[in-house]
Structure formats: structure tokens, C-alpha cells
């Protein structure tokens, strides 16, 4: 019955704020909505954000490690390349020296062969010259004997 009397009484005209059950009801609604949003939205979104941040930090750490490894490998390969170039350069120098030595040796052999052939030719020519002189001397002696014989016979 008291409820009925209150319902019939109407709303009293108050001042700036009316102190009735609306304000605490709104406060309870705000608190319930906060808990509900926290449970249904903010926690899952926060978890996703934290997972994403963890993934990003892990990915960045892995990328830094891989970058450091790549830089080490690059330095090692550069050192190996430098060593290989030096080795190739020394092989080239050795080959050039060997070719130069072989060239000089072949040139010396060719000069020796040419000198030997020249000396043999000179000896052969000298022998032929001496042979020709001997033949000529023999013919000269024969001709001179023939001339003397003819002169004396005449």
C-alpha cells in the first residue's frame, strides 16, 4: 500500500538535483558496463596487442641476429675473396716468371742451335773452300806443268 501512495504522490519539485534512485542506478550501470567491456573487449584486445608486441619484438630480435650473422658471413666471404685474389695473383706472377724462364731458355737454345748450325755451315764452307783451293791448286799445277811443257816444247 505504501507503494501505491508513493506512486500517486507524483514527483516533488526539487532544486538543482533530485536525489532519487536514478543516480545510484546509473552508477551501477556504469560499473557493470565497465566490467562487461573490460571482460568482453579490453582484455581480448589488450591480449592481442600484447601478443602482437611480443611477436614484433621477437621478430626484431631475430632480424638483428640474422643481420649480425649476415654481416659476419659477409666479412668472412670478403676475407676469403681477398685471400683468393692474393693466391690468384701469386699464381699469375709465378706463371709469368715460369713462362719468362721458359722463353729465355728456349731463346738460349735457339741461339745455341743457330750458332751451332752457323759454325757447322762455316766449317762446311771452309772445308769446301779448302777442297776447292786444293783442286784449283792441283789444276793450276797441272796447267802450269802443261804450259811449261808446251813452252819448253816449242
Swiss-Prot record:
Keywords: ATP synthesis, CF(0), Hydrogen ion transport, Ion transport, Membrane, Thylakoid, Transmembrane, Transmembrane helix, Transport. GO terms for cellular component: plasma membrane-derived thylakoid membrane; proton-transporting ATP synthase complex. The keyword Transcription does not apply. It is found in: Cellular thylakoid membrane. GO terms for molecular function: proton-transporting ATP synthase activity, rotational mechanism; proton-transporting ATPase activity, rotational mechanism. The chain crosses the membrane at residues 22-42. It is a single-pass membrane protein. Belongs to the ATPase B chain family. F(1)F(0) ATP synthase produces ATP from ADP in the presence of a proton or sodium gradient. F-type ATPases consist of two structural domains, F(1) containing the extramembraneous catalytic core and F(0) containing the membrane proton channel, linked together by a central stalk and a peripheral stalk. During catalysis, ATP synthesis in the catalytic domain of F(1) is coupled via a rotary mechanism of the central stalk subunits to proton translocation. This is ATP synthase subunit b'. It comes from Synechococcus sp. (strain CC9902). The lineage of its organism: Bacteria, Bacillati, Cyanobacteriota, Cyanophyceae, Synechococcales. The gene is atpF2.
Amino acid at each position: 500500500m505504501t507503494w501505491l501512495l508513493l506512486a500517486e504522490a507524483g514527483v516533488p519539485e526539487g532544486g538543482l538535483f533530485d536525489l532519487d534512485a536514478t543516480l545510484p542506478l546509473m552508477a551501477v550501470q556504469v560499473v557493470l558496463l565497465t566490467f562487461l567491456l573490460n571482460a568482453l573487449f579490453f582484455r581480448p584486445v589488450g591480449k592481442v596487442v600484447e601478443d602482437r608486441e611480443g611477436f614484433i619484438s621477437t621478430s626484431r630480435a631475430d632480424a638483428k641476429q640474422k643481420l649480425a650473422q649476415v654481416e659476419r658471413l659477409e666479412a668472412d666471404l670478403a676475407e676469403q675473396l681477398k685471400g683468393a685474389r692474393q693466391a690468384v695473383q701469386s699464381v699469375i706472377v709465378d706463371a709469368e716468371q715460369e713462362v719468362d724462364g721458359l722463353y729465355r731458355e728456349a731463346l738460349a737454345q735457339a741461339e745455341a742451335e743457330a750458332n751451332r748450325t752457323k759454325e757447322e755451315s762455316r766449317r762446311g764452307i771452309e772445308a769446301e773452300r779448302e777442297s776447292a783451293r786444293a783442286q784449283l791448286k792441283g789444276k793450276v799445277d797441272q796447267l802450269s806443268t802443261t804450259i811449261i811443257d808446251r813452252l819448253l816444247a816449242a
